[in-house]
């Protein structure tokens, strides 16, 4: 392997590692305001940092003070040149697995019973239009021995291409008096562009009539017209009786 290829490989590994570190830092700092993810984009003017969160105003801060602090940390701690921070609001937080995982972890930290908090999270996800959802809580739930409880609603994909296309998964941890508890949220969702392969939808009568009419028009365009009696006689060279 040439030196140039090694340098390219090292460069992309360093970029990926930097993004993971920045993501962990922002998740630790803003988990209570619905932090979702971060994107780093290289530009000729520097690095564009896009932060996705449920409560974007809490990350911006009063008069932009919080964003200024984030910019300083990104530049000094993580070595990101000229970071330009942009905060984007998550439009459907109930369909974002990481936002819901942090919500569930915060509810456990505030003292809510794990089963009640899990079912509340599940209902909100399904109420937002998800295909299915799974919520898993693990730790010392009701005794000295660690265990887990899992709650499922709808259809949750666990294998195949639909896991990549339609499934969102996130994990969060919370420190309680009894120890550390973990939560896992899996959401199967669909959009106008991405739909499940096994989805069956019955067309409405209006859609069926529209399809039938279209087929009839295509058949009329492709089907040749029947020849008249005179044309038939001329082609055969005979006479009508």
From Swiss-Prot:
NCBIfam families, per database record: PRK04191.1 (NF003219), uS3_euk_arch (TIGR01008)
Keyword Ribonucleoprotein attributed: yes
Family: Belongs to the universal ribosomal protein uS3 family.
Coiled coil stretches, renumbered: none
Entry's Gene Ontology cellular component terms: cytosolic small ribosomal subunit
Domain KH type-2 residue range list: 22-91
Top-level division of the source organism's lineage: Archaea
Name the record gives this protein: Small ribosomal subunit protein uS3
Function of the molecule: Binds the lower part of the 30S subunit head.
Gene Ontology BP annotations: translation
Assembly, per entry: Part of the 30S ribosomal subunit.
InterPro entries from the UniProt entry: KH_dom (IPR004087), KH_dom-like_a/b (IPR015946), KH_dom_type_2 (IPR004044), KH_sf_prok-type (IPR009019), Ribosomal_S3_C_sf (IPR036419), Ribosomal_uS3_arc (IPR027488), Ribosomal_uS3_C (IPR001351), Ribosomal_uS3_euk/arc (IPR005703)
Keyword RNA-binding on entry: yes
SMART domains: KH (SM00322)
Species classification: Archaea, Thermoproteota, Thermoprotei, Desulfurococcales, Desulfurococcaceae
Gene designation: rps3
Record keywords, A-Z: Ribonucleoprotein, Ribosomal protein, RNA-binding, rRNA-binding
Residue ranges of the region described as Disordered: 218-241
CDD domains per UniProt: KH-II_30S_S3_arch
Cited SUPFAM superfamilies: Prokaryotic type KH domain (KH-domain type II), Ribosomal protein S3 C-terminal domain
Gene Ontology terms, MF aspect: rRNA binding; structural constituent of ribosome
